[in-house]
Amino acid sequence: MSAIENFDAHTPMMQQYLKLKAQHPEILLFYRMGDFYELFYDDAKRASQLLDISLTKRGASAGEPIPMAGIPYHAVENYLAKLVNQGESVAICEQIGDPATSKGPVERKVVRIVTPGTISDEALLQERQDNLLAAIWQDSKGFGYATLDISSGRFRLSEPADRETMAAELQRTNPAELLYAEDFAEMSLIEGRRGLRRRPLWEFEIDTARQQLNLQFGTRDLVGFGVENAPRGLCAAGCLLQYAKDTQRTTLPHIRSITMEREQDSIIMDAATRRNLEITQNLAGGAENTLASVLDCTVTPMGSRMLKRWLHMPVRDTRVLLERQQTIGALQDFTAGLQPVLRQVGDLERILARLALRTARPRDLARMRHAFQQLPELRAQLETVDSAPVQALREKMGEFAELRDLLERAIIDTPPVLVRDGGVIASGYNEELDEWRALADGATDYLERLEVRERERTGLDTLKVGFNAVHGYYIQISRGQSHLAPINYMRRQTLKNAERYIIPELKEYEDKVLTSKGKALALEKQLYEELFDLLLPHLEALQQSASALAELDVLVNLAERAYTLNYTCPTFIDKQGIRITEGRHPVVERVLNEPFIANPLNLSPQRRMLIITGPNMGGKSTYMRQTALIALMAYIGSYVPAQKVEIGPIDRIFTRVGAADDLASGRSTFMVEMTETANILHNATEYSLVLMDEIGRGTSTYDGLSLAWACAENLANKIKALTLFATHYFELTQLPEKMEGIANVHLDALEHGDTIAFMHSVQDGAASKSYGLAVAALAGVPKEVIKRARQKLRELENISPNAAATQVDGTQMSLLSVPEETSPAVEALENLDPDSLTPRQALEWIYRLKSLV
């Protein structure tokens, strides 16, 4: 900022501002001045654009006008929310000195820094989404990645081995703010994300990270957390923790542990798969018609967030899955009783985080009290459920009767928003507070008595006693009777139609009342802070209970969904394979106006790949996606939309479904398709579930068919993954005849004249035709174009045998049986008579043939 160059020429107040701003050069500084937060210079210009507020000028300092913008202090949360949503960070600078006793500018300091990844205020957070701060680190061996949800204390790290895995993690976690080292090499991974923060290299130093983490957890080493041998992850975690402490300006007691996330613990899904399956976000970027929109009928925000974490990290531990299944089954008869009580618990998880940060507001404590009041009823209902996992969950929930009693005594039923407004602590909680309040509240009675007495003493019927926030207490007499005011009445204020006076007795009482109000408010703030001190020793138990309540909400929700939507409990088997009887797509069946056609699926070591053919709009993509979604739901422990499901081990789910140009990276549709295909061929295993839809369609027919054939061969013969391979290349239906483990299925349709009816049912065998022209007509392509297309189709189908030796079912020309072209060198040799050549001619022919090869 150029203003710093002439520092001594500025006014004392602007010097104070510039010193504070120099400590936070990269972020906006909200500088408190009375009832406003002001921004100056470049901050003011930036804020006026981001917030659409007026840009003005504040006089001059150092001979230059000062650009200025301001917002009222009481509306600051709304403006902070707008800035945070745009990825901005803000330093909040408050007046901490007393203006009455200050010589020069009032003392100010930055009391907190609001950043997109470290917010905990209820008004700034999306209640049903995690809000993560993340840090990324890279060295020659791979990546380190750490995430922290400061609104819950959940701290995780991982070590993605390659770029694709790192990209998948970024999409899964979708951090609100991402810290990266100043020499980070893979900038294309993170470019375009909001909330990027460039950090110096020393913040990622491994020894500093270990020291930071041990200090936070009160441990000597990190062995107990299972992260000791994760140096790259620890580098990221150390930077992240230091950043969180720097911005919060307080201890973080709710962050008590760190967990290592390992690839082998969950089903891996790359970024393309998460996008294509529309788990929590649809392809248009919204939340409608996603898997979460169907499954998430949780009644608490913390339950909703946990369910979304489960959906994005399906677990592979069948012990955990069977426990969840058992719990869901046991709870199905209890959902109607449990959900109304759980709804009253609210977002206890985030309230506890604000308690730990000492930023909890009075209404947070009132909500906490209300949550505690539900626990006895919840525990009583759960006690009647005959299920060991349910009882284990119940044991994690304390009753906290003492804390409930404390909050019932301490906080009024409906407290104000802020403690500074007063009236938070209940009557009877503190004797001294009650005395000060009685003195302040008794003012009304006193004023009424004084008014009656003075009116009788003076005989002035217009006399009345009142209070004004600016001038304090007064005795008011109309202008017509003011000349009759007693001599001891001292004029305090003149109005148009009246005079206001003060008398020594009233002045003395005013001082007493105002003192009592100030002391009552100061004592109330002290008692409020003491409540934190009484609650915080129980923080660990409270967080454990909040986690158990969130899990109960998820499981009760899944039980309700299973019953309402007619889901069945899947069976886990040890061998490779998926067998589904009458499977349904969980989202499509909810949005269709007509009944959904359920379909079977059978994948096993002897039937690893299904070649799926059929018309456009016939349901191939729906069939493939429903298989992946049923597998995903099974591996979060949920019941699934089918009559019966048996499912074996799955380590990864891959999808190559649809594509669009990646213009920002300069990649065409076909390039995107091939990149995703390469990722599958490199990383899939025999325990992977692979969905391949229309491979090779983005290039020439020969190239596309050849690639599709080779990919199918590789997946079936080399990788041996469980694969659903949808295609319009009818030549691929020959694959089952050429290799084992492959079968043909198709989705049927009926054509009548120019109309087509899609049956949406899966049948064995290959489709007889593609119905492409019928679908085009259905889409509204002009009739003359359809007519010309039919003519061209007949020409192509009747093409000479030299161009296409074989046809598939008489409807599509074969592209695999095109005769190979003869080499020019071979043709020349066939026409050559060696006996007629001279030695010189023979030598010339050798050179000629050499040029033809």
UniProtKB/Swiss-Prot annotation:
Summarize where ATP binds, as residue positions.
Answer: 614-621
Give disulfide pairs as residue numbers: none
Taxonomy, superkingdom: Bacteria
- GO biological processes: mismatch repair
Query: What does UniProt give as GO cellular component?
Result: cytosol
What Pfam families does the entry give?
A: MutS_I, MutS_II, MutS_III, MutS_IV, MutS_V
Q: Which UniProt keywords apply?
A: ATP-binding, DNA damage, DNA repair, DNA-binding, Nucleotide-binding
Instruction: List the Gene3D superfamilies.
Output: 1.10.1420.10, 6.10.140.430, DNA repair protein MutS, domain I (3.40.1170.10), MutS, connector domain (3.30.420.110), P-loop containing nucleotide triphosphate hydrolases (3.40.50.300)
MF terms from GO for this chain are:
ATP binding; ATP-dependent DNA damage sensor activity; damaged DNA binding; mismatched DNA binding
Q: Which HAMAP family match?
A: MutS
Summarizing the function annotation, the protein's role is: This protein is involved in the repair of mismatches in DNA. It is possible that it carries out the mismatch recognition step. This protein has a weak ATPase activity.
What family does this chain come from, according to its entry?
Answer: Belongs to the DNA mismatch repair MutS family.
- Its protein name is DNA mismatch repair protein MutS
